[in-house]
């Protein structure tokens, strides 16, 4: 069976990617990261999801949180803003996060003989993070095949970003068709330890809009003080 490394945050997009990779016949090796996030709920979700969806293995890599300063997702002194439409890159951007995650996934993939890596990056309904754009994914794939023994020998890597051009509505519709239980996922930037969402951040807003527009019941659990 073909192997794939799937970056799994515990959120809606990465879980859909895991389901899609499995539907394509891959043995999926899920890879998650502890990098000083505000809460552990998403990693708990990733663990549940990997087990529920039958991942071949699930590894959680701990990174030095000092690498990721200046982001509201890793620095409790920086407030996570409520959603607002803006072309600017918000304070929730984590410096070079996807570059680091993909580099780790690449090394893991080469070591286990996998040549496919899945990432839930999307350039639609997103917060303008530069490392979610298609040109970044294409460039990293080029790097992967220039910087590895396998790539140089012609056993090429593919960086799969199947949600790249899908709206949140389309992603939810796809996942629903694949049987994804979105009640297992946590997307909120500042969920509490029980996995209950704030309902106000960018990620919550895109998620709420997606379920509503898709006509799919939203299984998200919200904090009691939140008015939805």
Curated annotation (Swiss-Prot):
Keywords: ATP-binding, Ligase, Metal-binding, Nucleotide-binding, Queuosine biosynthesis, Zinc. Coiled coil: none annotated. The keyword Nucleotide-binding applies. It catalyses: 7-carboxy-7-deazaguanine + NH4(+) + ATP = 7-cyano-7-deazaguanine + ADP + phosphate + H2O + H(+). Its cofactor is Zn(2+). Zn(2+) binds at residues 188, 198, 201, 204. ATP binds at residues 8-18. It comes from the Bacteria. Binds 1 zinc ion per subunit. GO terms for biological process: queuosine biosynthetic process. GO terms for molecular function: ATP binding; ligase activity, forming carbon-nitrogen bonds; zinc ion binding. Its EC number is 6.3.4.20. InterPro entries: QueC, Rossmann-like_a/b/a_fold. Pathway: Purine metabolism; 7-cyano-7-deazaguanine biosynthesis. SUPFAM superfamilies: Adenine nucleotide alpha hydrolases-like (SSF52402). The keyword ATP-binding applies. It is an enzyme of class 6 (ligase). Belongs to the QueC family. Catalyzes the ATP-dependent conversion of 7-carboxy-7-deazaguanine (CDG) to 7-cyano-7-deazaguanine (preQ(0)). This is 7-cyano-7-deazaguanine synthase. The lineage of its organism: Bacteria, Pseudomonadati, Pseudomonadota, Gammaproteobacteria, Legionellales.
């Amino acid at each position: 069976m073909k192997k794939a490394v799937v970056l799994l945050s515990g959120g809606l997009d990465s879980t859909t990617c895991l389901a899609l990779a499995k539907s394509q016949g891959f043995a999926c090796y899920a890879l998650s990261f502890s990098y000083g996030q505000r809460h552990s709920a998403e990693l708990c979700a990733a663990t549940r999801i990997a087990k529920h969806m039958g991942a071949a293995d699930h590894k959680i890599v701990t990174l030095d949180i000092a690498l990721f300063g200046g982001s509201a997702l890793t620095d409790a002194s920086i407030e996570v803003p409520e959603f607002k439409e803006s072309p600017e890159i918000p304070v929730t951007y984590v410096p070079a996060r996807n570059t680091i995650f993909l580099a780790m996934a690449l090394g893991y993939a080469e070591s286990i003989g996998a040549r496919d890596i899945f990432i839930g990056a999307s350039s639609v309904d997103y917060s303008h993070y530069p490392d979610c754009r298609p040109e970044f994914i294409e460039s990293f794939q080029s790097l992967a095949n220039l910087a590895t023994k396998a790539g140089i020998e012609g056993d090429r890597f593919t960086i799969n970003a199947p949600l790249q051009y899908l709206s949140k509505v389309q992603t939810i519709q796809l996942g629903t068709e694949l049987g994804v239980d979105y009640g297992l996922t946590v997307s909120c930037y500042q969920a509490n330890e029980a996995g209950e969402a704030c309902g106000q951040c960018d990620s919550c807003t895109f998620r709420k809009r997606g379920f509503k527009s898709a006509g799919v019941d939203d299984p998200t659990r919200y904090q009691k003080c939140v008015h939805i």
